[in-house]
């Protein structure tokens, strides 16, 4: 499993549209604790999601939601060129889940090491054609670590259970 931190921030207004970012989907800053930001463009909600994976996420693991919120607001303010106080004043809600500390996941996503594609096939192999496994970690067609991979593996298992030609 790879570590990742995902932080949802809801604001009173879409503060990222105050500059030339009106039609932005992603913002990226290599040097910050939360380097990646994305919105649900073309939907124009006042919600932005921060994403830190790998070594960047380690700086946030085990922190309280308040500590993560302060770090995230600071990172977002820097990437937008705004004052942290301005951003914090417009913040209405924060959602943060510590996937690393979650006893049911103990991480956030899978990734394949070089030469490791066979492990995904092994993880997705049914046991005596009665117990089937799905999930992005069992997806070997190039979409591991993604929602797309989770869905594709679910379709694969559904087809295997239903039998040939039953699910299209």
Pin down the residues of each PLM region.
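Rossmann-like dinucleotide/flavin-binding elements
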Residues: 9, 13-19
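Conserved flavin/dinucleotide-binding core of flavoenzymes
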Residues: 3, 17-168
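Flavin (primarily FAD) cofactor-binding/catalytic cores of flavoenzymes
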Residues: 1-6, 11
């Amino acid at each position: 499993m790879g570590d990742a931190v995902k932080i949802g921030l809801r604001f009173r207004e879409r503060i990222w549209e105050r500059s030339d970012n009106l039609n932005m989907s992603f913002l990226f800053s290599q040097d910050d604790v939360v380097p990646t930001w994305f919105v649900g463009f073309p939907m124009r909600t006042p919600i932005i999601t921060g994403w830190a994976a790998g070594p960047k996420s380690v700086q946030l693991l085990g922190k309280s939601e308040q500590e993560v919120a302060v770090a995230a607001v600071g990172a977002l303010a820097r990437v937008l060129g705004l004052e942290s106080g301005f951003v914090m004043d417009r913040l209405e809600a924060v959602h943060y889940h510590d996937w690393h500390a979650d006893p049911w996941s103990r991480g956030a996503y899978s990734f394949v090491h070089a030469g490791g594609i066979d492990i995904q096939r092994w993880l997705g192999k049914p046991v005596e054609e009665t117990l089937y496994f799905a999930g992005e970690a069992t997806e070997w067609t190039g979409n591991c670590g993604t929602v797309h991979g989770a869905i594709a593996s679910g379709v694969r298992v559904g087809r295997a259970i239903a039998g040939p030609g039953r699910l299209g």
